Every structure is written in C-alpha cells, then in structure tokens.
Amino acid sequence: MARLVTEWVKITADVSIVALQSGEVWFHTPRDTKENQDPFATPMSGVGSAGSTVGLLDGAINLGFARIEKRLARPDPTIVGYIVALVGAYHTSVDTPRNLRRAASRFNELGRPEVAAYLEERAREETGHDRLALKDLRALGVPGERLVANFVPEGIKPLCKRFDDLCVRDYPIGCIGYSYCLERIAALKQAADIEKVQAICPDDVDATRFLRSHSSLGSEAAHVEETIEFVASLPANDRIRVVQETYESALILAEGYNHELLKSEAEMLEELEQALGEALPHLHSSRRFGGEKRGARPAA
C-alpha cells in the first residue's frame, strides 16, 4: 500500500501546520516533541497531494484569523456598511488582472511556463469584476466611479499594497497564496448571506452582482478547487511559500475586516460623504439603519 502523503510548513517561529493526504490537519509546536527530535524541523521536500495541500492552505487561513477571532466584529449588514464593502471590493479587484499578468510574465522569464499559464488564465477570469462592484454602487444611488476614485477604505489599503508588492517580486509565487486566501473566504458565503444583503437593499434593486460572483454561488468554489490541485503539483519549496503567504494575507485580511467593521454607521457615512464632497440624504433618511449601529462585513 502506498504511503499517505504528509506535508508540513513552518508558519511562525513556534507553529507549523501538518496535513495528511487523508485530510487530517493539526498545528505542531516544538514543545510537542523532545529536544532535537522534531520531525517537522526540516522543510518538507516530497510531493504534494490535494488532500494535504488543502489542509495546509485552509489551516493557514484559520491560523491567520485565530489571532483576532475573539475580537472579530460580527455586525448585521447595513446599506452604508455594504457600500463601503463594495468600494473595498472594487479596489481589491481592479488591479488583479494586471498584477497577475505581471507575475505571469516574470515566470515566463524564469522558465516556468506552467505557472505563467495558470496566472494568465486567472487574469482572464478576473477581468471585469471591478465593474460589477461599480454597477452595484450605482444601483444603490451612489456615483460609483467618483467614489472609488476618491476613497479607499483604510482596512483595505494594506491588502491592496500586499498584492501589488507580491506581484513585482523577483519570484512572485506568493501571489497564489494571496489569491487563494481571498477566494477561499469568498467561497464561504452562502445563498443566505446574499439574501441578508438583498433584504436591506431597496425593493427592485439588484446590488449583489459582485457578491454573487464572489460566493459559493459564483465561480469561487471552482477556482478554489483548481488552485488546490495546481498548488499540490508544485515543487515543495513553492508549496511552502504559497502556504506561508496564505497565512500572511489572512492576517492582513482579518485585521482589515476588523478595522472597518468596528466603525460606527455615522463614521462610515462621514467618510463616504467626504470622499464625494456631498451629502447622501437617501442614506441619512433610510429607516433601515440608525445611530451608532456597526457596519456590514466586507463583500470581498
């Protein structure tokens, strides 16, 4: 009988993720073993498998969010919070095709056509998603183009910068980990989550195009599965880097979520109006939100 694949990646100074092909995953610390007998001290060098790779990737996301899990805000969705989320969604998607093509070009230069082809296909699939967010903003009565030109939510800025930086590195394999993190989180959104957002929108208004596309109802689930298979096929050093970046991106994403979600309704509305240079009276007068109620979880 063939031996099951075991993969492991050191994530922090004292935590490694260990995953078996069977799907079993655990977090390993050096204190779990006797001195000088840590079986996971040396970086892995063997082949990967889909079962163990998904354990590493999802384990990295869980570990990234674990640091703030107890203080992670979980408010009910509101229109103002959702508008801020759509602006964030625009900024995390508008440069994705360009960045992925830039990374693909670098891998072609490095003689890695298989990685370049994967990234080029992802770039094609992500093209135009920023326009979905703009359509949703316009459907909510907001001048989307002007808003996104003048406003980037503070919690989103570090995430956008991270992706930009990853894609211009000499060896930009980490961009796959970043992309997986965002797509995996998006794929967790179910029909019920979209229905909650639709329920706070004005009647006969379709403002969930981006959210539907970036949920379990859209292409994200398929993208996640494809990425798992592709990462599993990579050399061990590449798999290690992808998993480590998945963790780093999860940290940034979690902190960004919380930064935006802890703002009051009034704070978010003030930011929107300052960016536009005008009041948004239809948001002030809406009966669906009030006072210091907290905002909606970002859409991307």
Predicted regions and their residues:
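Non-heme di-metal
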Residues: 1-299
